[in-house]
Every structure is written in structure tokens, then in C-alpha cells.
């Protein structure tokens, strides 16, 4: 668990093709942790997996959220397989639900990470 505070990353907005975090509009997929985020320029699954492993060496991650426009339809894609291999609980949902779920869980002080692709 982390203490929710002013430095916790929260969504300020999201919509078709973008996220707004910390006053910045981001148009790429993001990997987000309670205290930082990374704009992912391409879907290099090894980079995503390695970043999560590095973070989990620092903090015990309660949950990984995978948000994408296809929701559960993406449950057989390569990213899902890589995330499942980490042996951390994984929830797959559509992008909007992932943004809302992220906001609720970090406000509760939960240590979650999420890989979220913008809606099209």
C-alpha cells in the first residue's frame, strides 16, 4: 500500500485518442504507476514487462490493469500473455473503465500499475 497524496498520478481527463495526466495531454499508450507514468511510443512488450518488474522490486504491486479499446476481446493478445507471466493479478477492461478503476484504487492507497491504450 502507498499513502495517497498530492504526488499520486491521477487522470485529469481522457477521450478519443488521448489521456490528460499532470496537465499534459498524451496521445500514446501509457504505463502508469502511483507516482509516475511512462508514455509508450510503441508496444514493445518487453519494455512494459521490464518496467513493471523494476517497479515491483520497489513496491508490492496489488494489481495490474490492462485497459484497451477492445476490453476483454484482447485477452489473447501478446501483451496479455506477457502481463500474465508476471504472476500479479491482472484485470482486463476497456480504456474508460481502466481510467476510472485506476482513479478509485490509487485514491484508496492501493499499489496498482496499469498499461492503458487510448480509445480510438
Spans of model-derived segments:
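Long, charge-dense
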Residues: 95-106
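Short, surface-exposed, polar/charged, turn-prone segments marking secondary-structure boundaries
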Residues: 47-48, 58-60, 91-95, 118-120
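Mid-chain, well-packed structural core segment of small domains
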Residues: 55-92
Amino acid at each position: 500500500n502507498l499513502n495517497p497524496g498530492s504526488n499520486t498520478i491521477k487522470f485529469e481527463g481522457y477521450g478519443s485518442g488521448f489521456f490528460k495526466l499532470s496537465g499534459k495531454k498524451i496521445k500514446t499508450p501509457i504505463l502508469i504507476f502511483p507516482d509516475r507514468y511512462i508514455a509508450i511510443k510503441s508496444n514493445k512488450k518487453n519494455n512494459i514487462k521490464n518496467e513493471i518488474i523494476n517497479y515491483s522490486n520497489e513496491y508490492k504491486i496489488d494489481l495490474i490493469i490492462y485497459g484497451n479499446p477492445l476490453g476483454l476481446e484482447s485477452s489473447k493478445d501478446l501483451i496479455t500473455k506477457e502481463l500474465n507471466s508476471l504472476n500479479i493479478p491482472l484485470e482486463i477492461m476497456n480504456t474508460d473503465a481502466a481510467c476510472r478503476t485506476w482513479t478509485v484504487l490509487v485514491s484508496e492507497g492501493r499499489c496498482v500499475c496499469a498499461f492503458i491504450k487510448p480509445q480510438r
